């Protein structure tokens, strides 16, 4: 069941759901708007001949931060990682779904490629997979609304929520845009 604005506020008031920093004006009828942080991970296109999910490629991305008061410019066809300004903490009976903002989608900005689902028990910044499918550069301003977090109540609490040792939670507690750890899904060679 998708949580309403009333349900979201009740979960926050009870301390079960965490969104920090929280601004009540960001609560929408069935979601909470989230904002863009100031850190980005850009791909180093000359470090490797290709991306191999089975290999640890630590120099695949570089962390960058625009100067204070300046935007990050995302060029057509470019893909970077960003993150939410907010740290989100979900209890073991709520899952999240990150959706883009309609106004930004109409400009050609995609906020996630495939990973818009947030497991119950997750705690951390939500990494954004930002793509510009427009024909012109898009300026991304730290602090701007970048997406909306929808919350869904599970039929029962997760037996092994994200962060428990049983599920191999690679991104629990992540801070800022976190690069892929897909290599951990492969047997070490």
From Swiss-Prot:
Protein's recorded name: dCTP deaminase, dUMP-forming
Keyword field contains Nucleotide-binding: yes
The keyword Hydrolase is annotated on this UniProt entry: yes
Pathway note: Pyrimidine metabolism; dUMP biosynthesis; dUMP from dCTP: step 1/1
Domain of life: Bacteria
Annotated active site: 129
GO molecular function: dCTP deaminase (dUMP-forming) activity; dCTP deaminase activity; nucleotide binding
Catalytic activity: dCTP + 2 H2O = dUMP + NH4(+) + diphosphate
Top enzyme class: hydrolase
